[in-house]
Structure formats: structure tokens, C-alpha cells
Amino acid sequence: MIEDTMTLLSLLGRIMRYFLLRPETLFLLCISLALWSYFFHTDEVKTIVKSSRDAVKMVKGKVAEIMQNDRLGGLDVLEAEFSKTWEFKNHNVAVYSIQGRRDHMEDRFEVLTDLANKTHPSIFGIFDGHGGETAAEYVKSRLPEALKQHLQDYEKDKENSVLSYQTILEQQILSIDREMLEKLTVSYDEAGTTCLIALLSDKDLTVANVGDSRGVLCDKDGNAIPLSHDHKPYQLKERKRIKRAGGFISFNGSWRVQGILAMSRSLGDYPLKNLNVVIPDPDILTFDLDKLQPEFMILASDGLWDAFSNEEAVRFIKERLDEPHFGAKSIVLQSFYRGCPDNITVMVVKFRNSSKTEEQ
């Protein structure tokens, strides 16, 4: 009886080895496991895949940083992958901008200074377009110049004026939006743009923001001080305003107004402006330079902020202020290699009280 049982088990073992160890059987087993994981454990699989992608991004970022610090030409190797780049350097301000992985470049920037005569405060602007480049180009080519003219008039008779930097900024931003909407509506152009403007005088820094471009300042202690706050649909104040206007927000990778726009305020975007769910009203803040004694500020499109936190960006730039672009070029390249899919524009402005800053 025992011998018969052993013989039967031995026979079953040989049969199982014959079938289970065949290549086609192993292949079918792998396919079955993959299908079972996909249909019954989708979330777990997605988590593993996302973690793997994040790990790859981190490794690529580390490689990029090593190459960026390589004085033997590492940056030139990286730049070969960019379809288009723009750069600017003058006195205490430097800008670096790349098209990156996008098919079109919709970022714009502008710098207007009069360091010799000081007929107006220095004007720095970042404009991150969407739905085409029309809106960003329109605002970039008109708003800074309009601000310059009004600020020059204001400086001539400041003591007797009822205006201020804040009121001039608000008036001109709203005016340029109305003017642009008329033209975009006629041509059925649905383009829009953010608007981040900083006015730098001897004692004050005034920053106006519409959208999700962002400004951050490094104070005397190395702290990251926010100069603006992103206008996002998920924010309670913005969400309530959109709901009161009869609109809605929905999630499609990110929270969007009417399921379309990933910011709650912008210039342009005439279809959403007609519904009153997106507005052009800027938030404006003024900072006392004597109190903060800042070293530098960063103004950038959201391509940077998708890859860096405020604090991380300040630390990164602080370590690279001696570079030709004050670290702007390096942080743009690092953002690209962290996987940012967007256009990336970074402006770094060094303040005159910094020991490393050229005379403003």
C-alpha cells in the first residue's frame, strides 16, 4: 500500500514538473499574474509605477546636478536637449528661460530699469501664457512700458499725487486685460496668461500677481519669504467666488475652473471671463527692504515651482549666486531634469545690500 502511494506521488511529481516547467506554461502564468494585478490591484500597481518614476526622476536630477557643477562643459551637454532657450543678464538681474518639453514657448519676461537717473522704479515681469502665446506676448510688450510711463509721471509729483505704486499697478493690469479681451474676442483667440510684476525702489518692493507664477525673496537670515500667493481653484476663497458666479471646479490631473483652467485668475481667457468665473484682479503686496535686508529674489513661472519648493529654491540659488546667471540657469536645468514638462522661466534679482551684488 505504501509502495503504491509513493509510486503515485512520484508519477504526479514528474507530471507536474513536465507541465509547470515548460516555457509556455511559465509564460501563461506570468500573463495571468499581470492581468490579475491589473484588474484587482490597480491602485497598488499604480503606486509602484509612480514610485519607480519618482526614483528615476530623482536619479536624473542628481546626475544633472553633477553635470551642472562640472566646469568642463557639463551644461553644454544638457543644453543640447533643449529646443529653445532665452537668457538675459544686466547689472543685478539675470534670466534664463527654456521651452523644455513643450511644443511651443508660451513664457515671456521683461526687465525695465533706469539705474542711472532713477526716473522710475525697476520693473520686473514674468508672464506664463496658456492656450497659445498671444496673451503673454501682448502683456509683455505693453504692460511694462505702460507702467514705466505712469510711474515716471508719478515720480515727478509724488508728494501731491493721490496714487501709489499699488494703485498704478492695479489700474494698469486691469486696463491691459480689458484692452486685450476686446482684441482676443474679435479673433476668437482663447489664450490667457499669468502676470507677475515687481517694482523695486530704494526702500520698497511692491509685487502684483495674477495667476500661478510666483515670487520668493531670500531675507538677511536666508529665510524664504513669499512675495505672492498662487491663485488656484481649490483655495477656499477662490472656490466660493467661482461658485457664487455660477461656475464649478473639477479635478482632471489638477483642479480646474469649468474643467478647463488650472488657475482661478488670469489675463485673457475671454470665454471664462464672460462667465465671470475667472477674474483679472491682482493681489498686491509691499515689502520694506530696510526691515528685510534681502539678498535676492526669485520670480518664476510655475515650471520652476512644480519641481522646487520656495525654501529649496532659495537654498539652491543662495549657493550659486557667484555663477554668471546668479543660479538662474542652473535651477532651470535642474527643474528640467527633475521631470518638469512645462516651459521654465526663472529671474533672479540681487539686492544692492548683498555683499556679492553689483552696484544697482
Curated annotation (Swiss-Prot):
Tissues expressed in: Ubiquitous. Highly expressed in heart, placenta, lung, liver, kidney and pancreas.
Residue spans, topological domain Cytoplasmic: 43-360
GO BP terms in the entry: cell surface receptor protein serine/threonine kinase signaling pathway; MAPK cascade; signal transduction; sphingolipid biosynthetic process
Binding-site list for Mn(2+) 1: 128-129
Note describing how the cofactor binds: Binds 2 magnesium or manganese ions per subunit.
Matches recorded under SUPFAM superfamilies: PP2C-like (SSF81606)
Topological domain spans for side Extracellular: 1-25
Keywords: Hydrolase, Magnesium, Manganese, Membrane, Metal-binding, Protein phosphatase, Transmembrane, Transmembrane helix
Superkingdom of the organism of origin: Eukaryota
TM stretches of this protein: 26-42
Quaternary structure note: Interacts with MAP3K7/TAK1. Interacts with MAP3K5.
Function: Acts as a suppressor of the SAPK signaling pathways by associating with and dephosphorylating MAP3K7/TAK1 and MAP3K5, and by attenuating the association between MAP3K7/TAK1 and MAP2K4 or MAP2K6.
Protein name in UniProt: Protein phosphatase 1L
Organism name: Homo sapiens
